[in-house]
Amino acid sequence: MKMRRKMSEPHGEAGNEMPNKKQKLSSDENSNPDLSGDDNDDAVSVESGTHPERPDTPTNTASAPGRKSWGKGKWKSKKCKYSFKCVNSLKEDHGQPLFGVQFNWHSKEGDPLVFATVGSNRVTLYECHSQGEIRLLQSYVDADADENFYTCAWTFDCSSSHPLLAVAGSRGIIRIINHITMQCVKHYVGHGNAINELKFHPRDPNLLLSVSKDHALRLWNIQTDTLVAIFGGVEGHRDEVLSADFDLLGEKIMSCGMDHSLKLWRLDSERLQRAIRGSYEYNPSKTNRPFVSQKIHFPDFSTRDIHRNYVDCVRWLGDLILSKSCENAIVCWKPGRMEDDIDRIKPNESNVTILGRFDYSQCDIWYMRFSMDFWQKMLALGNQVGKLYVWDLEVEDPHKAKCTTLTLPRCTSAIRQTSFSRDSSILIAVCDDASIWRWDRLR
């Protein structure tokens, strides 16, 4: 089924006027975007092996005080056990950068593999089928032509089990789409500027985290339409927040941004647990008082010793952190010393322990985000010239991580984000030239 549906205007304003585009750093002026799949290329290059030496950057010169690292220098990537083949590609007809892509990991076994892309004022849903087919399901267009969606995240309705997709971008408005009823069912206005990333809580499908250009993070309850907490202020981020992630238990948030910092925020405090419980109990029809959102001004840990530039992507890997900047490396690290329990880290802790680096090349522009598969066994990142790097994370020591480089002569535009299907059989990459690339894992 194909469709295009306009999303209605919200009943409130998002605050100050916001830029309508992210920094566009790579494009193909001669492209003729369409939605027809390209012919499969049997001559796909799947290169594995050692990467060339990476030039020195401020992050691999002298170590910051309190830093500790396993081993010396860099490690060489050996042949990775994972192999992929590009089986299909297509271009969306708006021709603008696609900033985000996410598979729906909440689907049941046997259901079609559905993923969403966001870019320009468009949200598009696709199904992956056998023989490399990518089938267009639905396309939603925002009523404001100046909207530019940057991020999306999947959850589900607890009462109906319908999959829900949250999207947001330059206007700072969060929209919730039910693709079964084909409607934008909710929207949230609160941030004073663009929203750069959305994440749902790993154990509570109603808790949505948003991070913004207004220097703050917000935690929402989409079941009761309440703003649970605002993270920022006195000791919060000093510039645009670019990324954040929940740990697997949903007890901690790590955020990062343009101020080069990474900050840890705990959700398991009595104050926040009480606020979350209160958000479920709040009923506006029974009271005239608005819900009182918690304002969290002080993070539980903060550091600027990992990166020397914008930190544009962060993910938890167990109790470890993976983060990247515009420095051609993803850094694996942990707060405190190696032997420290992360749950006992104090806000004044100044030590960080660097365990390893995943090096790559030609990726020194910002807002390029990596992803992991559901079981956190693979790590994927694209660079600004269309190359994909896939690391095998099933190693005891990050220094022994193995990498595969995926290249295609036709893919030369910046890869903004990647996403694995839940079973890790498919890897999707989206690019600045509105192209979508499907890589199937070879068994």
Swiss-Prot record:
Keyword annotations: Chromatin regulator, Nucleus, Repeat, Repressor, Transcription, Transcription regulation, WD repeat
Biased composition (Basic and acidic residues): 1-14
Region (Disordered): 1-74
Compartments, record wording: Nucleus
UniProt keyword Signal present: no
Highest classification ranks of the organism: Eukaryota, Metazoa, Chordata, Craniata, Vertebrata
Keyword Cytoplasm among record annotations: no
UniProt function note: Polycomb group (PcG) protein. Component of the prc2/eed-ezh2 complex, which methylates 'Lys-9' and 'Lys-27' of histone H3, leading to transcriptional repression of the affected target gene.
Record protein name field: Polycomb protein eed
GO CC list: ESC/E(Z) complex
Family: Belongs to the WD repeat ESC family.
WD repeats: 93-136, 148-187, 190-230, 236-277, 306-343, 361-401, 410-443
One BP annotation, GO: regulation of glial cell differentiation
Stored PROSITE patterns: WD_REPEATS_1 (PS00678), WD_REPEATS_2 (PS50082), WD_REPEATS_REGION (PS50294)
InterPro entries reported in the protein's UniProt record: PcG_WD-repeat (IPR051243), WD40/YVTN_repeat-like_dom_sf (IPR015943), WD40_repeat_CS (IPR019775), WD40_repeat_dom_sf (IPR036322), WD40_rpt (IPR001680)
Source organism: Danio rerio
Oligomeric form and interacting partners: Component of the prc2/eed-ezh2 complex.
